[in-house]
Amino acid sequence: KEGYPMGRDGCKISCVINNSFCKVECQAKWRQSDGYCYFWGLSCYCTNLPEDAQVWDSSTNKCGG
């Protein structure tokens, strides 16, 4: 599984071409994962996630309220 990790506010975690920051963010939540900064979305994106990982989903987006 893969997807956008969420911060405490339910929003995607922002980045600006900083893959190492995103890798740390992903591995803090899911130890075996990897991550990078998705340039077009300016958000961290995680890969190698467990199937039950909770990631940002546009249909259940609670960001900003």
From Swiss-Prot:
<comment type="similarity">
    <text>Belongs to the long (4 C-C) scorpion toxin superfamily. Sodium channel inhibitor family. Beta subfamily.</text>
</comment>
<feature type="disulfide bond">
    <location>
        <begin position="26"/>
        <end position="46"/>
    </location>
</feature>
<dbReference type="GO" id="GO:0019871">
    <property type="term" value="F:sodium channel inhibitor activity"/>
</dbReference>
<dbReference type="GO" id="GO:0005576">
    <property type="term" value="C:extracellular region"/>
</dbReference>
<dbReference type="InterPro" id="IPR018218">
    <property type="entry name" value="Scorpion_toxinL"/>
</dbReference>
<keyword id="KW-0738">Voltage-gated sodium channel impairing toxin</keyword>
<feature type="disulfide bond">
    <location>
        <begin position="15"/>
        <end position="37"/>
    </location>
</feature>
<dbReference type="GO" id="GO:0006952">
    <property type="term" value="P:defense response"/>
</dbReference>
<protein>
    <recommendedName>
        <fullName>Putative beta-neurotoxin RjAa8</fullName>
    </recommendedName>
</protein>
<keyword id="KW-0528">Neurotoxin</keyword>
<feature type="disulfide bond">
    <location>
        <begin position="22"/>
        <end position="44"/>
    </location>
</feature>
<feature type="domain" description="LCN-type CS-alpha/beta">
    <location>
        <begin position="1"/>
        <end position="64"/>
    </location>
</feature>
<keyword id="KW-1015">Disulfide bond</keyword>
<keyword id="KW-0964">Secreted</keyword>
<dbReference type="GO" id="GO:0090729">
    <property type="term" value="F:toxin activity"/>
</dbReference>
<keyword id="KW-0872">Ion channel impairing toxin</keyword>
<dbReference type="InterPro" id="IPR036574">
    <property type="entry name" value="Scorpion_toxin-like_sf"/>
</dbReference>
<dbReference type="InterPro" id="IPR003614">
    <property type="entry name" value="Scorpion_toxin-like"/>
</dbReference>
<dbReference type="InterPro" id="IPR002061">
    <property type="entry name" value="Scorpion_toxinL/defensin"/>
</dbReference>
<dbReference type="Pfam" id="PF00537">
    <property type="entry name" value="Toxin_3"/>
</dbReference>
<feature type="disulfide bond">
    <location>
        <begin position="11"/>
        <end position="63"/>
    </location>
</feature>
<keyword id="KW-0800">Toxin</keyword>
<comment type="function">
    <text>Beta toxins bind voltage-independently at site-4 of sodium channels (Nav) and shift the voltage of activation toward more negative potentials thereby affecting sodium channel activation and promoting spontaneous and repetitive firing.</text>
</comment>
<dbReference type="InterPro" id="IPR044062">
    <property type="entry name" value="LCN-type_CS_alpha_beta_dom"/>
</dbReference>
